[in-house]
């Protein structure tokens, strides 16, 4: 008895079963089998990152040090996220703390004044190494996060009694965080980070600076926080999934392209130099066999004499009748020689278009616009430039919120705790919670960095004015977009107005015109209202 076979339904290609063809193609062999050899393993982020972690960061370091585009990408992050001054805008959660809004504002003014004196001291007392102000530390942290994927800051205590505040900070390179004695990873110790069963960091193993290399390497274990809740070691990175222990640098997705672009540029430059090096060549009628006899057979005395004699004859001839290209003399060559002029060839040969394509790919991977990365703003309209700047601005604002502000806020909390203990600033007496009970509420703050790039200053100002007049924005938000604090702007305007009045100066013409226009409009509205009544 014959067993009947059920026919298999095939897809449009006539080879793949219809069941497989109707599913997600990404998990199959693809059309024509293009994906059949693509079988990446399914790994956790630590399994994919940590085995080659040191080498990947070393390559990123090399790119930033020796590649102009990579260095520019880091500079863009520093300039657009932090800028020249990272300004504190302290705003405690006064409703939660049970204090009045005016009390909270008065407390914030005291805190901001004391913090600025401590953080931006020219003597750099905030830094253990006495090299950085607070803004410089934030800029370094942003750069560190950009090309290493994470940043580390150690909160320390100055034992000397020469200064009011003892709180200090040390920037720690990610290269110094590693397992003791370079041992392998374990379940609770990965890449220098000791974690609990839930994945929370308990402490970090920090090695001493190994330079110049002959000194024995030592590791120190530093807890992530002290028993009282004070941060001891600040670690900031953006995890992409659960269980991630260390941060991945942003260059991983474009590292190969950046390195190949660097090699391509060097090769293109060498090619251009070689093509421009020779204006003309003199070709001799000496055949290949004779030339090889001269060159390869020069070990014998006879061949050396023949080669020396031949070169001597040529040198003597052209010494008596030199060949010149820049003069008016028409050269008369040695019999059998020919002069060939080398025309300059196009050294580009489609290279610029190919370079732009690579740079667009790299810019997309780094989160910046092509124009900012390449510094090429040619052939751009205002709308195109504005759209490109807004895309990058959204990326930079995310990094400011989750990287720079997190680092700054944790450093600020360490200082604020000491400032309260030393009574440099005094908590409102009617507060519901103490500092230890509500650290986040007392230390809640925003950070104002560099302003958004203005493509057209006039249009940017008009937009801000219209948003405020329409009630869709506030002076605080619009000033923050420009990198300014609205309270400082208002206070300065009041001082300038009073000084101009005392000096007998009239208000600016535009201010007077705006005031008269507003007064005229208000009068007309009142008249129309009275008529309607």
Report residues per predicted region.
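Structured, mid-chain assembly/scaffold modules that mediate subunit interfaces
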Residues: 76-239, 467
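N-terminal-proximal low-complexity accessory segments that begin disordered
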Residues: 1-101, 531-533
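Extended, charged amphipathic alpha-helical segments
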Residues: 233-388
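Activation/maturation switch segments at domain boundaries
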Residues: 2-3, 337-348, 390, 458-533
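Charge-rich, acidic-biased intrinsically disordered regions
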Residues: 39, 132-138, 155-172, 287-300, ...
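Short coil/turn segments at secondary-structure boundaries
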Residues: 155-157, 273-279, 373-377, 477-482, ...
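Short, Φ-rich (hydrophobic/aromatic) sequence segments
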Residues: 67-98, 137-146, 251-271, 280, ...
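Surface-exposed loop-to-helix/strand elements on domain peripheries
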Residues: 128, 328-455
């Amino acid at each position: 008895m014959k067993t009947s076979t059920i026919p298999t339904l095939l897809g449009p290609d006539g080879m793949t079963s219809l069941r497989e063809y109707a599913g997600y193609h990404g998990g199959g062999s693809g059309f024509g089998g293009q994906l059949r050899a693509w079988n990446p393993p399914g790994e956790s982020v630590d399994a994919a990152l940590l085995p080659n972690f040191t080498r990947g960061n070393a390559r990123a370091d090399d790119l930033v040090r020796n590649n102009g585009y990579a260095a520019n990408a880091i500079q863009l992050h520093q300039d657009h996220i932090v800028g020249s001054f990272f300004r504190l805008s302290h705003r405690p959660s006064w409703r939660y703390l049970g204090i009045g809004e005016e009390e909270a504002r008065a407390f914030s003014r005291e805190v901001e004044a004391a913090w600025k004196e401590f953080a931006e001291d020219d003597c750099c007392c905030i830094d253990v190494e006495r090299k950085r102000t607070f803004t410089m530390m934030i800029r370094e942290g942003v750069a560190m996060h950009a090309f290493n994927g994470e940043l580390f800051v150690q909160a320390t205590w100055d034992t000397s009694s020469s200064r009011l505040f003892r709180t200090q900070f040390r920037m720690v390179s990610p290269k110094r965080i590693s397992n003791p004695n370079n041992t392998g990873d374990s379940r609770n110790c990965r890449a220098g980070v000791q974690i609990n069963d839930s994945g929370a960091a308990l402490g970090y193993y920090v090695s001493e600076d190994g330079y110049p290399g002959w000194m024995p390497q030592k590791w120190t274990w530093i807890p992530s926080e002290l028993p009282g809740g004070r941060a001891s070691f600040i670690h900031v990175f953006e995890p992409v999934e659960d269980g991630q222990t260390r941060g991945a640098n942003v260059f991983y997705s474009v590292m190969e392209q950046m390195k190949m672009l660097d090699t391509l540029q060097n090769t293109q430059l060498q090619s251009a130099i070689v093509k421009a090096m020779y204006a003309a060549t003199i070709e001799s009628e000496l055949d290949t066999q004779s030339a090889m006899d001269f060159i390869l057979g020069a070990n014998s005395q006879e061949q050396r004499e023949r080669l020396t004699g031949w070169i001597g004859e040529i040198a003597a001839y052209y010494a008596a009748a030199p060949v010149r290209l820049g003069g008016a003399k028409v050269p008369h060559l040695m019999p059998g020689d020919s002069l060939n002029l080398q025309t300059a060839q196009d050294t580009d040969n489609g290279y610029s278009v190919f370079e732009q394509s690579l740079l667009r790919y790299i810019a997309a991977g780094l989160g910046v616009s092509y124009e900012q990365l390449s510094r090429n703003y040619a052939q751009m309209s205002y709308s195109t430039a504005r759209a490109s700047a807004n895309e990058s601005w959204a990326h930079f604002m995310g990094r400011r919120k989750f990287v720079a502000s997190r680092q700054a806020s944790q450093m600020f909390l360490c200082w604020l705790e000491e400032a309260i203990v030393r009574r440099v600033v005094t908590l409102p007496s009617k507060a519901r919670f103490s500092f230890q009970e509500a650290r986040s509420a007392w230390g809640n703050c925003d950070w104002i960095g560099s302003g958004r790039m203005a493509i057209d200053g006039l249009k940017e100002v008009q937009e801000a004015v219209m948003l405020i007049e329409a009630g869709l924005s506030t002076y605080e938000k619009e000033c923050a977009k420009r990198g300014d604090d609205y309270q400082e702007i208002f206070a300065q305007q009041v001082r300038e107005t009073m000084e101009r009045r005392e000096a007998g100066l009239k208000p600016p013409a535009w201010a007077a015109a705006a005031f008269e226009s507003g007064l005229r409009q208000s009068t007309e509205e009142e008249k129309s209202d009275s008529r309607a009544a």
